[in-house]
Amino acid sequence: MPAADDGTPAALAGRVVLVTGAAGGLGATAAHACARAGAIVVLLGRKVPKLNRVYDAIVNDPAGLPEPVNYPFDLAGAGYDDHAELAMRIQAQLGRLDGVLHCAADFAGLTPLEHTDPAAFARALHVDLTARWWLTQACLPMLRQAGDSAVVFVVDDTVPGAAYRGAYGIAQQAQLALLATLHAELAASPVRVSALRPGPMRTPLRARAYVEDQDLRARDPARYAEACVRLLAPQGAVHRGQVWAPAP
């Protein structure tokens, strides 16, 4: 069993965790942190070469981490049946699922709603809200089988009604409603739901709205990787039903 530096069992030892957007800024570093914490990580993302880099970083870690599983998947184009098939494949290959970390997001850049491309609006709303729910819904039967499991939504710090964020900004607020509803409905179940609201991070997504060398507030996403692990681990129970905004 993987152990922490002090010899105690690692926080996610024996668990299987699905990370969406696993090749992205936060997703990649969070996936590696989950593996360091003892989890078998299912790496979900669109681009195979980028997923392979995350996979290689984990399997080549000198600590000898559990081997992850690559699952190329396009959230924007997948139907609900594709999400259900993903859940069935995890069940067949790994036999369990203990956590889902939603890092994948779609944001085309700052644009007035009036001038937003209709297809881009629909895509962002789907990836940032509908696909997150579809995947959660498909995985709930497996998550219920675990004695303790977690669904974690990574949300932005976008102020409600902030201009030019388009469907991305709207989806951020809708996710909070989804979180509250799921928390109420799953209160008596072993499935915990919570959200992580990291501070500004230096990621390709944020670069679509800010000039990097002028974005003095942004931090390395690695600063929030351990927060992801905490919410997925049993210790995350203290944040059940909440939006956690840890200090960087």
Describe the function of each predicted region.
Residues 16, 23-24:
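Conserved glycine-rich cofactor-binding loop
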Residues 39-54:
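Conserved glycine-rich Rossmann-like NAD(P)H-binding loop of the short-chain dehydrogenase/reductase
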Residues 114-133, 152, 175:
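Catalytic Tyr-X3-Lys loop
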Residues 20, 97-105, 128, 153, ...:
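Rossmann-fold scaffold of SDR-type NAD(P)-dependent oxidoreductases
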Residues 76-84, 88, 105-122, 164:
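Conserved mid-core segment of classical short-chain dehydrogenase/reductases
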Residues 61-80:
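Rossmann-fold cofactor-recognition segment
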Residues 106, 133, 144, 148-188, ...:
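Catalytic loop of short-chain dehydrogenase/reductase
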Residues 188-191, 195-196, 203, 211-248:
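C-terminal helical subdomain
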